[in-house]
Amino acid sequence: MDNYTYSELLKSLQNKCDNIALIIKPEKIKQELERIEKEQEDPNFWQDVLKARDTNKEKVRLNRLLETYQKTKDSLDESVELFELAQNDNDEVTLSLLYEEAPTLEHSVQKVEIEIMLSGENDASNAIITIQPGAGGTESQDWASILYRMYLRWAERRGFKSEILDYQDGEEAGIKGVAFIIKGENAYGYLKNENGVHRLVRISPFDANAKRHTSFASVQISPELDDDIDIEIDEKDVRYDYYRASGAGGQHVNKTESAVRITHFPTGIVVQCQNDRSQHKNKASALKMLKSKLYELELEKQQNSTKNEEKSEIGWGHQIRSYVLAPYQQVKDARSNIAYSNVEAILDGDIDAILEGVLIAKA
């Protein structure tokens, strides 16, 4: 990096920071935080528990956004000042340090951009994830289990928690399907663009001839809805099936019909849950999954109507990402058009760069 390149980077970052300020309006955020604090001082504040909870969530979000923005702006202003001084004094040591810190500064500005993008209605929610293997038997079932582990590792890296709702072992390896919740701040916001088909190309560990195989798996993401969001489901539109649990979480297999499957006839959506010994709890969890999927489907329809889109991104028809392990190693996302070479780390849950790249590409 040289003086000209760094100078252009600073101009670009300053321009981005100015645009961010126009969007978030820091002074208005401060005023809103003052208003919330006064509201919380009211003795009657906690009488409406749901409203109080939502107000607290908003306070945390605004505080975090303001703090992230201010910290980034201060760092950028300091870098601009140091750069001018170092240029005037021909201070090569300081210039070298500034060049080294440039990627960190760039990432800080990007982090604020991401914060703004995660301010949608459900972005702060937990994420319900369903993974289904495509055609191909063991190959696709193994690929589905690799994706499942990838998301679990991503959650672990962020300090998020996960909970299995339904898990079906594959016949030889992998899984026939899994549904689980990732619980953490902005989990849905980060993962919402994972909806679609994920493609794997590799030398098959199940092929004695060591041939290259292509496998597919479908990932669906929906927000875990708060209890105060009312989604009505007509009983005549659903069928409940009860069966014996099996697989992970179903160690009491063949004892009780505690697992629950719900089929929603108007949409064709099928959800199932077997993570608990209680049929009642499994039914409640399955209903929560169904409501989340119906809510997501309705939002998708509205968005497609607004954008006049002909095709949904959810389902088998839309391939969003390719993971190639042979003859070369590369992960490429179709939305951001960015290719990544750290395939092993990605499959171990290091997917923040991919998720953020897609958020920015779709902004």
From Swiss-Prot:
Post-translation changes:
Methylated by PrmC. Methylation increases the termination efficiency of RF2.
Gene3D superfamilies, sorted: 3.30.160.20, 3.30.70.1660, Release factor
Q: Where in the cell is it found?
A: Cytoplasm
Q: Which InterPro entries match?
A: PCRF, Pep_chain_release_fac_I, Pep_chain_release_fac_I_sf, PrfB
- Which terms are listed as keywords in the entry? Cytoplasm, Methylation, Protein biosynthesis
Residues modified as N5-methylglutamine are Q251
Under SMART domains, the record lists: PCRF (SM00937)
Q: Which domain of life is it from?
A: Bacteria
What does this chain do? Peptide chain release factor 2 directs the termination of translation in response to the peptide chain termination codons UGA and UAA.
Q: What is this protein called?
A: Peptide chain release factor 2
Q: Which species does the entry assign this protein to?
A: Helicobacter pylori (strain P12)
Gene behind the chain: prfB
